[in-house]
Amino acid sequence: MPRSSQPIIEFVRLPDIPLEELVAHMSDPRVRTHMPLLTFSWDLEMAAKFVAAKEACWQRDGLGHWAFLADGRYVGWGGFQKEGEEWDFGLVLHPAAFGLGMPITRKALAFASEDPRIPFVTFLLPPSRRNLGALRRMGARFIGETDYDGTRFLKYRLETSGPVGAVSRTA
């Protein structure tokens, strides 16, 4: 059977990824460009603290951030984090994997649409993000600007309980 051109996307837990890979990923200036809260340098200690904090979200909320693999290779991290009463979705890809954003997002949103705790997700994007067409095509709507840790973000909301056409169940 011929294989499609899209890689096989897997979601694994962050502790499954070597800390050195996380440090290299988060130290890439192309990644840092759109992360205004990333004002510090990453090293092994910072990566270990990051993984521990994200795992604490899993313990507290039963959901959190994953590491993403494409054909078994680490390509980034992201997922859902509870912010007050809302579930925020974040995605931080390695520059070589920027084209995998939609397949990964669709797979995550299909997961969210099956979870009754998540009637909608929010997306917080820095104003430096200009290409927002994919977000709009998914059905996300702009709900305003918000301040997070003293930094301005654009906030979008996407209903996860809507028609299946809005959120594809395949990656």
Regions found by a protein language model. Give the residues of each.
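Acyl-donor (CoA/ACP) binding surface of acyl/acetyltransferases
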Residues: M1-T33, H65-A171
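Hydrophobic alpha-helical core bundles mediating ligand binding, dimerization, or RNAP-core interactions
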Residues: L22-S27, A47-K54
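Conserved GNAT-fold acetyl-CoA-binding loop/helix
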Residues: R32-A52
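A short helix-loop-beta-strand connector motif used in the catalytic cores of GNAT acetyltransferases and
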Residues: A52-W66
